[in-house]
Amino acid sequence: SVLKEIDSVGLWSVESWGCAIFDSCIRYLGEDPWERIRNIKSKMPNTPQQMLLRGQNLLGYKHYSDEIVHKFIEKSKTNGVDVFRIFDALNDPRNMETAIKATIENDGHAQGTISYTTSPVHNLQTWVDLSLKLQDFGCHSLAIKDMAGLLDPYVGFELVSRLKEEINIPIHLHSHATTGMSTTTAIKCVEAGLDNIDTSISSMSMTYGHSATETVVGILDNTDYETKIDLEKLEPIAKHFREVRKKYSNFEGSLKGVDARIITSQVPGGMLTNLENQLKEQNASDKFDEVIDEIPNVRSDLGFIPLVTPTSQIVGTQAVINVLNNERYKVITKETSALLKGEYGKTPSAVDKVLQEKVLNGESPVTCRPADLIDNNEYDKTKEKFLKVIGESKLDIEASEENILIYTLFPEIGMKFLENRDKQE
């Protein structure tokens, strides 16, 4: 199988689980995400399996109790995840600390992550300070998550050079190709001392994705930085995914090359496709450019937050509403309101005071770590609710910790998946 071929390459890790993968399994594929990671792990015994984890948000769009974070990471490690890439959409270290410590306690590799962005309030020292904090938490490595492809080659060189002076854990780079800079940035970062790069196999690379594995390997061959990866081993893998891509061509975004507007709008690749679909469903595809122009304005109002799940969805949806209503903030979404109230954590800079006062309605904003406000018996309460639902519905569903976690993170679609799991074709 293609998994055995990937396993023979000698990669540092393969990102095969977490976030959108878990969601897609139960929402679209009718596939048990826990079984998926067990199967992948069994077929790739030589390659560490990696997942993306949204810190205190885990895989979802809200904060969970420390108890649930510990439980989820424990079960993820047991089922086959080795490397946990942990980030927070606001770069609030308080939202990453529990997940990092839970990973370490379960003998996983904790990779602390900075969600790279640019703004009037972000500079080199911002990233150095956050990286030092993540190292202090005990992280085994650091990832620079450049989800919108904004890190240019020379800033990348400067950033990695400075980080290598300040921290002593390995540094990884995750950069999307949307702006056309990812490959050049990767090479400059390697020259500055970068330890590892995220790439995609050539047939699934570039545009919304990452630089091609083969391209990066080829560039670094016969240099002081060569990867020791055999290009010939990559060809059958590229061939396999070339066919897979044809099968799902109807679901691809419209971007065919580079979209330089992202350098100013800062919209990540995944967010672009979501916006296109959102506007298409509302017969408003012609408003796409207006929405792209509105996004930086909303982001500024919300404290120059990075655009990565879930903040990318919050900003994107609010921008769409502002444009379609032809009036800014006539309607404020529940999620935008929560962010203004401080319920997601500390924003990089102060949010718009007028908007904040409007949603607070005389109350005080949240200034503590949001998870400190959550009842730590959340897991037991969710388990009781789960048992009650399957009991009343007379459903033959095992009350395993994995199933309870599916229900905890995705109550509606999770239960629908569990009800129909044995009926999938």
Predicted regions and their residues:
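Terminal or standalone catalytic/regulatory effector modules within metabolic enzymes
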Residues: E5-C25, L255-I262, Q266, G270-E425
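Active-site beta->alpha loop and helix N-cap motifs at the rims of alpha/beta catalytic domains
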Residues: S13, W17-Q135, C139-L142, G149-P153
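Short gly/pro/ser/thr-enriched loop/turn and capping motifs at secondary-structure boundaries
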Residues: T117-P120, T179-G180, S203-Y208
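Catalytic cores of alpha/beta
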Residues: H122-L134, T179-D195
